[in-house]
């Protein structure tokens, strides 16, 4: 069953195309990633998906319902975890959950029960009476996630769920999301963290300039666009560049540094060290970040 079905979604702002007739779908119990550099069209797409922004044309269906005609019914079945901290600083941790539950007309006794369960799940029970200002960044992020789940949604939309968190807090959030994934929750995730996307997403798309560049499973995309291994060579000279060209090795030439992509880089690593001993060579596994940079470029986006 398709939880999300987007067909030819298009958005223009004063003649500027932000999203250019994209189509994709998300299956039930799937974690689906939406990746792209700044200004690629991710946020615009997400805002159209949860009804904050009308599309110029195209269609969006959630749970088989049209987002424009059936928005009230759809809204009751989704949870949204925004990148910004939108918690009420004047309320306690527990009160933030209860107030949000009122938006969904959840009975008070049920809201109390769900609040207890969610605070326990996200390891926040000991902070239930604390004000939001007293929470660490990781705790606040977990509370935002808990709040997004108060209506027991069938679809969770996560906008940069771990941005700004330290490694410990980040991994704790990932573990909680993996537990929810194992329980059958469907999620749409936007993230700049390639490790996060590789770890959580069953499938993903990479979008740039409003267009979908690729779609697939993380490991398959890595194998196709970046091989199995990467060899990074510093101070690459002309002789080495000719060697790469003659042997038709997939690569990015970054000036003094070359990045080589290969199905098995071990032999290449040995060759570089043997024949080009002056070169500094790093041998590592290919990652989703390699794919992302190959497809979207390395120029800074602001």
Enumerate the language-model features and the residues they cover.
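Catalytic Walker B motif of ABC-type/P-loop ATPase nucleotide-binding domains
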Residues: 156-159
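Conserved catalytic motifs of ABC-family nucleotide-binding domains
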Residues: 152
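ABC transporter nucleotide-binding domain
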Residues: 174-263
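Conserved ABC ATPase "signature" region
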Residues: 98, 102, 109-127
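Helix-to-loop junction immediately C-terminal to a conserved catalytic motif
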Residues: 50
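Conserved ABC ATPase signature
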Residues: 90, 131-135
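Conserved ABC transporter NBD signature motif
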Residues: 58-69, 73-74
């Amino acid at each position: 069953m398709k939880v999300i079905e987007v067909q030819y979604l298009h958005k223009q702002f004063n003649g500027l195309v932000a999203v250019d007739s994209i189509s994709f779908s998300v299956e039930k119990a799937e974690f689906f990633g939406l990746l792209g550099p700044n200004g690629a069209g991710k946020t615009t797409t997400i805002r159209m998906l949860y009804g904050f922004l009308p599309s110029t044309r195209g269609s969006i269906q959630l749970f088989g319902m049209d987002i424009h005609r059936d928005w009230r019914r759809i809204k009751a079945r989704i949870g949204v975890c925004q990148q910004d901290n939108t918690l009420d600083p004047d309320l306690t941790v527990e009160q933030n959950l209860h107030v949000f539950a009122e938006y969904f007309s959840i009975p008070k006794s049920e809201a109390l029960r769900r609040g207890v369960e969610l605070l326990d799940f996200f390891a926040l029970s000991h902070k239930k009476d604390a004000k939001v200002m007293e929470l660490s960044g990781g705790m606040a992020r977990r509370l935002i996630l808990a709040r997004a789940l108060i209506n027991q949604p069938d679809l969770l939309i996560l906008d940069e769920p771990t941005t700004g968190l330290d490694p410990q807090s980040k991994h704790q959030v990932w573990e909680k999301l993996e537990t929810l994934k194992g329980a059958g929750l469907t999620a749409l995730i936007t993230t700049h963290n390639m490790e996060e996307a590789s770890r959580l997403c069953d499938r993903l798309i990479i979008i740039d300039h409003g267009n979908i560049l690729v779609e697939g499973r993380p490991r398959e995309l890595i194998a196709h666009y970046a091989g199995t291994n990467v060899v990074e060579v510093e101070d690459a000279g002309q002789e080495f560049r000719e060697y790469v060209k003659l042997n038709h090795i997939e690569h990015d030439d970054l000036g003094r540094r070359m990045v080589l992509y290969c199905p098995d880089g071990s032999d290449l690593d040995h060759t570089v060290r043997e024949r080009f001993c002056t070169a500094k060579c790093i041998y590592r596994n290919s990652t989703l970040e390699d794919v992302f940079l190959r497809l979207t470029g390395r120029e800074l986006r602001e």
